[in-house]
Amino acid sequence: MMELLREMLSYPFIVRALTGGLLISLCASLLGVSLVLKRYSMIGDGLSHVSFGALSVAVAFGWAPLAVSIPVVAAAAVLLLRITGNGKIKSDAAIAMISAGSLAVGIIVTSLTTGMTTDVSSYMFGSILAMSREDVILSAVLSIIVLCLFVFCYNKLFAVTFDENFAKATGVNVELYNVLIAVLTAVTIVLGMRMMGAMLISSLIIFPALTSMRVFKSFSGVILSAGTVSVVCFFIGLVLSYVYSIPAGASVVVVNMGAFGIFSVIQAVRRR
């Protein structure tokens, strides 16, 4: 095993993929706990399609992908909150509408311009070769922000997640925290798409939270477990991807599915 790790870490692209992937997995899992509990779990899937559309446009016109996609996806996240918040459109319908529309725009722009290039394909399906040094640096900055949010604003996040009316009554700026979570989720998705792909990046948000909820019942317990599960599953998935030459995104998702199954068995045993 140690020999395998030394071999993997001898490649700079593997080091970048491992470092950036672990940081993004941690961010996605922490934000995912709040999103799943607030029943916004599918927002990750919707924003990933928005991100694909924005990245496709950026690649087609030769613009900087991150400079285009981050503000676009962040704006889409805030728009989703606004639409679902006024109660006129259900959250799942709003996500499906924006998701399908953005994906359609991305496909049309790609077809009319560059075609399915390597860059566009990597955004759709993911590639461990796509993680750049700048992506790793941005992932580190994002991780610091997310960790600070959960450490220093834990009580407010707890209140906003479980009871927004109570949070408002205690003076918490609920809208600010909802927007903050949505924007951080958007940035996490954009950074993670290069490696996981638009089709699978939302799994980093959903799986760790749902897996941890099978065993842990407290908010803090779920957060700590989700972060641990996500990081461990990503590491195992990346190793399997390297050993068997399979896509990293798919490998990580399959490992997360295995973790969900194990935690479900533990839950069943504990109930007996």
Regions inferred by a protein language model and the residue ranges of each:
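Generic alpha-helical transmembrane segments of integral inner-membrane proteins
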Residues: 22, 26, 30, 71-79, ...
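Short loop segments and helix-boundary regions at transmembrane helix junctions
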Residues: 33-116, 212-224, 241-244, 267-269
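Loop-to-transmembrane alpha-helix initiation sites
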Residues: 17, 65-73, 92-96, 140, ...
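Helix-loop-helix "hairpin" substructures at the membrane interface of multi-pass membrane proteins
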Residues: 135-208
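Transmembrane helix-bundle core of multi-pass membrane transporters
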Residues: 4-16, 95-155
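Transmembrane alpha-helical segments in multi-pass inner-membrane proteins
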Residues: 194-195, 199-250
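C-terminal binding/interaction regions
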Residues: 4-10, 124, 128, 229-231, ...
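Membrane-interface capping segments at transmembrane-helix boundaries
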Residues: 155-156, 265-272
